[in-house]
Amino acid sequence: MTTSSNLISSDIEEYLKVHENKDMLRVLTCGSVDDGKSTLIGRLLFDSKMIFEDQMAAIEKDSKRFNTTDDSFDLALLVDGLQSEREQGITIDVAYRYFTTEQRKFIIADTPGHEQYTRNMATGASTCDLAIILIDARHGVQVQTRRHSFICSQLGIKHVIIAINKMDAIDYDQATYQKIKKEYREFAEDLSFSDVRFVPISALKGDNVVNESPNMTWYPGSTLLKLLNTVSVEQDRSESFRFQVQYVNRPNLDFRGFCGTIGSGEIRVGDTVATLPSNKESRVKSIVTFDGELEKAVAGQAVTLTLEDEIDISRGDMLVRPHDKPFSVSHFEADVVWMTEEPLCVDREYAIKVGSKSVYGYADAINHKVDVNTLEKQSAQQLALNEIGNCHFAVTEPVQFDAYDTNRSTGSFIIIDRLTNVTVGAGMIRNPIEVKSTKAHEYSEFEIEMNALVRKHFPHWGAKDISKG
């Protein structure tokens, strides 16, 4: 493998130091079936000189074995790792690939295009900053293009590059490119993207992927890789300090630290913080890491914080700025992606996990589900596998969160089946719900005892605990 940096051959330690300090961009690729997502990632890796010689030899061998292309080798096989993917020529699982340029590091998630793998795509999109949505130049904007764009919008991705692929198949026709560009812009007006860019490419031939295309001199913009290198996503990240405690570290009587990853914002030694839900305040005494103590820590860093005062803090509690607190309520509105065969039912109790805080809760109403192909809102009594819906949730105790649109790290949650411990859904919190206090229904002693027996002997019914109101 060759690299664009000469440091790797002359000074490996300096190369690693420079590499560590590069900005990280998480990228999602999605589009209709056979639009060329895996081939595009393979082309990025190949033209960036990020492929080992033994990998190339293996790909040439597999290309002949699976007959996936008429060329000597199929770049898509760099990404399609599952046996069933290679045999069918499609992507099923979310495949992650890593590469670096002089400007930044990349993690690329190659997600499946088929509707039955919507949950896989949602999983890949949940951590990405930017999406590359591929459109086949021969077919234009398809139903799956709309579905993937909607899911990206729902999951908070603000930056989108529309890569109009297979331009070689239409003789690099500018009019077709402009027509597709206009059609997508009209469709995307209702979505929450803040930055949409277009680039005509041929992943198979390499046009406008890493190198400029001599076949499309009419295109004045940048190549795909240049767009990836220059897009700025810093302004999308919340500046509010959020630190959720994952573990209380007490190795001896003289040390009590609170371990976790900073979700957003930054913290310095001496800063005043408030603990939630107790609302007690203290100051940061030290910021401890494996490599030693720090004066300052920022979003994404895993650290241990110690405080000047002895405050009762447990796993799931949150440290924030006293003047900048999140919502803390037990009822909220959320969009949910359902991920299992057994549907989401109203009033069935689940384990709800917001960050490291675990509570029990249920959907007390499904406001609507969304047809991901037409974006039409439909009434629903339940959510089936791969469906997306808007629900009202009630949990047993207040949880601390920000709206997902403003802070993805604290505005997301997962839904867990209490019996199997399987993650059955993923949610994005949109708004808190203020519940007007009303006189609680008075249950008889017999009803409470019967409810307790049902929950004990028939837990799979998912009955609520009526003794808690």
Swiss-Prot record:
Origin: domain of life: Bacteria
GO biological process, one term: sulfate assimilation
Gene3D superfamilies referenced in this protein's UniProt entry, alphabetically: P-loop containing nucleotide triphosphate hydrolases, Translation factors
Catalyzed reactions per annotation: sulfate + ATP + H(+) = adenosine 5'-phosphosulfate + diphosphate
Binding positions (GTP): 31-38, 110-114, 165-168
Top EC class of this enzyme: transferase
Keyword ATP-binding set for record: yes
Residues annotated as domain tr-type G: 22-236
Family per similarity comment: Belongs to the TRAFAC class translation factor GTPase superfamily. Classic translation factor GTPase family. CysN/NodQ subfamily.
Described function: With CysD forms the ATP sulfurylase (ATPS) that catalyzes the adenylation of sulfate producing adenosine 5'-phosphosulfate (APS) and diphosphate, the first enzymatic step in sulfur assimilation pathway. APS synthesis involves the formation of a high-energy phosphoric-sulfuric acid anhydride bond driven by GTP hydrolysis by CysN coupled to ATP hydrolysis by CysD.
Assembly behavior: Heterodimer composed of CysD, the smaller subunit, and CysN.
Full protein name: Sulfate adenylyltransferase subunit 1
Annotated source species: Shewanella woodyi (strain ATCC 51908 / MS32)
